């Protein structure tokens, strides 16, 4: 199997440059949370440490009850629905084409690299497509959409989502919406694919994660929800493969979803950091595109992205080249908001 190079390995020389800055490295390249996980999650994990038996692939009864309340209240109030907890969202993204035996997968032309990798692992053809679904190939098995999108933070509108659903129904294509940044709307509040499905989840799936909104990337806690027939197909394969969320993590996930106030607390932290970084990058001559939701600024100096990466590294700041996400990102860089308040302040000072 021939896979692309792991993108972040290519940043090593620039990390070395940035690390040599007299005041040290400020890493804004990877969207990994730095704030503490909620105490409710930590307590639930600690009190569930004794787990001698095998957990259920579908999730235990208390987690399932919580997940259904969460999904119904936020995304899909009526209509047939099923869901599964997953071991983070990345493994689900990487394995889903295999689990549903997809032969042709459509991904956004600027996209999270794991969409492509998942198609390659499945032996499927992978086609990058633009925004207009009327121009998409009609013979695909699976199409990934991402709203809010990583890396550029674009939010798909209600009309765009409805058009995609209509296209999918006409072409009998499965649509999976990666909504892992759903709770982090800034200039525009995101909509879930299921929110505009009029109670019909057939052929539709959504993926959500606790990693960013609850500072829980280390827990590997996420879920997939939607069409009961598709969830049943995915569940059966996952049962055979032993892809099961550990019982203590199920307990922590349930505790988090039962305490949604934590989302607002963390969102406010990111809002402040975003304002500081946005002003600093604009002041340094960058333009910022989209970035209306999510954990990143999609920025450009009007030059090839590796030049910008080196420019930032000379100032002790490590950011991500847009080319990692597709050829269309070649003149942009992605700036993560996931640094401490102090590091965000220091980065802004270096850009001044």
Label every PLM stretch briefly:
Residues 107, 128, 177, 319-321:
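Hydrophobic residues in well-ordered beta-strands that form the structural core
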Residues 2-88, 95, 256-257:
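N-terminal small-domain helix-loop-helix segment of the aminotransferase-like
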Residues 198, 202-271:
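Conserved core segment of the aminotransferase class I/II
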Residues 250, 254, 270-278, 288-300, ...:
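Conserved glycine-rich beta-strand-loop-beta hairpin in the small C-terminal domain of fold type I
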Residues 51-167, 183-199, 205, 344:
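Conserved core of the PLP fold type I
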Residues 122, 170-171, 200, 284, ...:
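Helix C-cap/helix->beta junction micro-motif
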């Amino acid at each position: 199997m021939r896979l692309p190079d792991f993108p972040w390995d290519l940043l090593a020389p620039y990390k070395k440059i940035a690390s040599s800055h007299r005041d040290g490295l400020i890493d804004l390249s990877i969207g990994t949370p730095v704030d503490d996980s909620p105490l409710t999650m930590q307590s639930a994990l600690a009190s569930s440490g004794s787990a001698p038996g095998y957990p259920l692939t579908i999730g235990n009864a208390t987690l399932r009850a919580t997940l259904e309340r969460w999904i119904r209240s936020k995304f899909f109030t009526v209509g047939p629905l099923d869901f599964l907890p997953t071991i983070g969202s990345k493994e689900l993204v990487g394995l889903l084409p295999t689990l549903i035996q997809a032969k042709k997968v459509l991904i956004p032309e600027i996209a999270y690299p794991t969409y492509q990798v998942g198609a390659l692992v499945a032996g499927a053809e992978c086609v990058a497509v633009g925004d207009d679904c009327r121009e998409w190939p009609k013979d695909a098995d699976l199409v990934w959409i991402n709203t809010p999108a990583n890396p550029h933070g674009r939010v798909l509108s209600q009309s765009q989502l409805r058009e995609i659903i209509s296209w999918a129904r006409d072409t009998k294509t499965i649509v999976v919406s990666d909504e892992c940044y759903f709770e982090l709307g800034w200039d525009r509040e995101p909509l879930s694919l299921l929110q505009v499905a009029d109670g019909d989840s057939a052929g539709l799936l959504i993926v959500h994660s606790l990693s960013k909104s609850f500072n829980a990337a280390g827990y590997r806690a996420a879920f997939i929800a939607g069409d009961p027939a598709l969830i049943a197909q995915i569940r059966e394969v996952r049962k055979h493969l032993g892809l099961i969320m550990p019982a203590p993590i199920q307990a922590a996930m349930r505790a988090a979803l039962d305490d949604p106030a934590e989302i607002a607390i963390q969102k406010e932290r990111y809002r402040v950091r975003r304002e500081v970084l946005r002003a600093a990058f604009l002041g340094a001559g960058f333009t910022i595109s989209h970035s209306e939701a999510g954990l990143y600024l999609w920025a450009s100096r009007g030059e090839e992205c590796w030049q910008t990466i080196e420019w930032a590294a000379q100032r002790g700041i490590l950011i991500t080249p847009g080319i990692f996400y597709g050829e269309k990102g070649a003149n942009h860089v992605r700036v993560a908001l996931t640094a401490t308040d102090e590091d965000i302040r220091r980065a802004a000072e270096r850009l001044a």
